[in-house]
């Protein structure tokens, strides 16, 4: 029997699990401090989404308003537990964030991507920002963007 994955909004009670997952995924210098994560839960509750099974945090995506354009979201983190990578959880979280973006009337989602993940984000509908000629295309160092066409 397969255990269903739930996508839920992060809450303060999830903070310890989020920190544990982050610590197992990033070196110390790339981890967000606890107070920043807590502030993100408070300020970005709609766009801080968790993937959970019955009793374990499997991954999360954290997005927030892009400071230079409040109608655009920026993905700050996409983290999947190493034992659950390559099982579609990242794609599930990206799809959930896109749904939230449509619901909240954001016009686009931006992200920075390391070279080894470019094709993954392209598969999920993100395009090279340099290929766009829109007000969202700017030389802010973002390499991928998804447009809300709804």
Positions of predicted regions on the chain:
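Conserved acetyl-CoA-binding loop-helix of GNAT-fold acetyltransferases
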Residues: 80, 86-99
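Conserved catalytic-core motifs of GNAT/GCN5-like acyltransferases
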Residues: 112, 127-145
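Conserved short alpha-helix immediately C-terminal to the canonical SAM/SAH-binding motif I
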Residues: 93, 117-120
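Conserved active-site tyrosine of GNAT-family acetyltransferases
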Residues: 121-122, 126
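Conserved GNAT acetyl-CoA-binding A-motif
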Residues: 101-113
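A short beta-loop-alpha structural element at the N-terminal edge
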Residues: 4-18
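Acetyl-CoA-dependent GNAT
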Residues: 12-13, 20-76, 81, 94
